[in-house]
């Protein structure tokens, strides 16, 4: 069973005289920074000149520096910028300011695990990865609660890296809920797998396949949209709150019987594909592909996104959502 840490397992004292630099001020960045400061810790923000987030961070009362200056001033440097830009920022801004007294921190293990960032051996490296979006991390903290997180140690040069990691987790409120010990390898590989085969790639492929099957069989696209996409939220919310068995408790017997008998057909086809995809992740094949795709300017990435934007399910959904005044109309672009 996993090792789980709570408030009583961590002490903020080890960070009391430290300066923590948060690189980035997006969803996670602002939540970490505000929570750490409210926990009594000294936080500064690192953002490039011209970043649209600089004024927001200043308005929230933080001292804002360039990433290099923040790295110079800080004892702990937390990377909360996109994975794809971290290696360049590390090489150009952070690495020149590193010494054995500093600690590198991450919220995702991709660049450490796949060696896009290779820190000096005398530097502590840890990960604290909340299992929820930044706005939830912040909201739960202000309510006196917390969002669960993962914690991992990559390098413990000082002998106190784990204490610092748990203190950081406590500072953002995660130990109120529970912090699960893992490794950079496990967090990275399971995170990529979940995104590709279940949460993002799996769900969107299942929606499109179901929608296309009904439309190709002569059913109205609008009806197919409701059955294969819109109603998914109802089921996911039940699973999220009560688990699979709890969801089944809340649906009709007809739906339940179809679930346990026909769902097995999907399982048998998909599981071997999932196993192959996991193997690609474990061997580093996906990482190499994605790194090269970025270096080439993302031609495949943009082409596939554009293809899916033109899918009929998107066109139908755009019109049907106009019939639903209860949906938020927030502009995502």
Swiss-Prot record:
Its EC number is 1.1.1.86. Substrate binds at residue 252. It catalyses: (2R)-2,3-dihydroxy-3-methylbutanoate + NADP(+) = (2S)-2-acetolactate + NADPH + H(+); (2R,3R)-2,3-dihydroxy-3-methylpentanoate + NADP(+) = (S)-2-ethyl-2-hydroxy-3-oxobutanoate + NADPH + H(+). NADP(+) binds at residues 25-28, 51, 53, 83-86, 134. Residues 183-327 form the KARI C-terminal knotted domain. It comes from Aquifex aeolicus (strain VF5). Mg(2+) 1 binds at residues 191, 195. Its cofactor is Mg(2+). Mg(2+) 2 binds at residues 191, 227, 231. Residues 2-182 form the KARI N-terminal Rossmann domain. GO terms for molecular function: ketol-acid reductoisomerase activity; magnesium ion binding; NADP binding. The active site is at residue 108. This is Ketol-acid reductoisomerase (NADP(+)). The gene is ilvC. Pathway: Amino-acid biosynthesis; L-isoleucine biosynthesis; L-isoleucine from 2-oxobutanoate: step 2/4; Amino-acid biosynthesis; L-valine biosynthesis; L-valine from pyruvate: step 2/4. SUPFAM superfamilies: 6-phosphogluconate dehydrogenase C-terminal domain-like (SSF48179), NAD(P)-binding Rossmann-fold domains (SSF51735). Belongs to the ketol-acid reductoisomerase family. It holds the Pfam family KARI_N. GO terms for cellular component: cytosol. Involved in the biosynthesis of branched-chain amino acids (BCAA). Catalyzes an alkyl-migration followed by a ketol-acid reduction of (S)-2-acetolactate (S2AL) to yield (R)-2,3-dihydroxy-isovalerate. In the isomerase reaction, S2AL is rearranged via a Mg-dependent methyl migration to produce 3-hydroxy-3-methyl-2-ketobutyrate (HMKB). In the reductase reaction, this 2-ketoacid undergoes a metal-dependent reduction by NADPH to yield (R)-2,3-dihydroxy-isovalerate.
